[in-house]
């Protein structure tokens, strides 16, 4: 039977690769993004692009009304933020949480009545390898993702009785994604002069990482998580994330 997945944050990066991967596997795909873009996904009767802003309840309701029945929700939409916490405006910290944390919770809560009623469904929450090992200069981002790690673990137990599975995909560092671009503030604005000697070698190391994650690594991990019927909760994605998971 043909299955349907709804994926958030499909305009680029992990979400775009995941939408392409599920479509290539024969699934029906509902690819959502704040501002739909033409030409980035294949034209197909099994693929629809819908507008969705996960921070707006009315947008969530409209997208789910338009989507029809779904079998899997992939909460991928997120924004990055790198810099010294001391220099991070709290308004920006709240914006990160609105998307990365409360947006995931809101999407999940909106689909649960459907999944519970049909006694099937999978929620896949995409977090980050920062949840596997603390890293400097991403304190707010880490906090937003760690919250979803705890949320997902608890929810997985809560929904077992309804045959609804909840999974985590933990991507590593992907230099080709728009992590630091998905924010209103540039990194250099968040590095005060006093932090520069500390920050410079860290950013230099990120420029030449020994191990990295690719978009296809994440798409394949999401695919495995969505189809996994075991009790496995965490699916690290990418060589660096897998290495961290071994020692976490």
How would you describe each model-predicted region?
Residues 11, 19:
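N-terminal Rossmann NAD(P)H-binding glycine-rich loop of SDR-like oxidoreductase domains
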Residues 128:
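Residue(s) in the substrate-gating loop at a strand-loop-helix junction
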């Amino acid at each position: 039977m043909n299955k349907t997945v709804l994926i958030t944050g499909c305009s680029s990066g992990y979400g775009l690769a995941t939408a392409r991967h599920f479509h290539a596997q024969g699934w029906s795909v509902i690819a959502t993004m704040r501002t739909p873009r033409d030409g980035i996904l294949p034209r197909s009767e099994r693929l629809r692009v819908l507008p969705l802003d996960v921070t707006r309840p009315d947008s969530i309701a409209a997208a789910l009304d338009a989507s029809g029945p779904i079998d899997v929700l992939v909460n991928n939409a997120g924004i990055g933020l790198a810099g010294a916490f001391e220099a991070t405006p709290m308004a920006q910290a709240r914006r990160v949480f609105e998307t990365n944390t409360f947006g995931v919770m809101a999407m999940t809560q909106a689909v649960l009545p459907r999944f519970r009623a049909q006694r099937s469904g999978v929620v896949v929450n995409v977090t980050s390898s920062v949840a596997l090992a603390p890293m400097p200069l991403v304190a707010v981002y880490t906090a937003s993702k760690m919250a979803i790690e705890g949320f997902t673990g608890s929810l997985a137990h809560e929904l077992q009785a309804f045959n609804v599975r909840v999974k985590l995909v933990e991507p590593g560092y992907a230099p080709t994604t728009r992590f630091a671009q998905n924010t209103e503030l540039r990194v250099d604005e968040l590095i005060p002069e006093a932090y520069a000697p500390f920050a410079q070698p860290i950013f230099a190391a990120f420029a030449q990482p020994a191990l990295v994650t690719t978009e296809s690594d994440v798409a394949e991990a999401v695919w495995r998580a969505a189809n996994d019927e075991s009790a496995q909760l965490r699916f690290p994605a990418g060589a660096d994330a897998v290495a961290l998971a071994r020692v976490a």
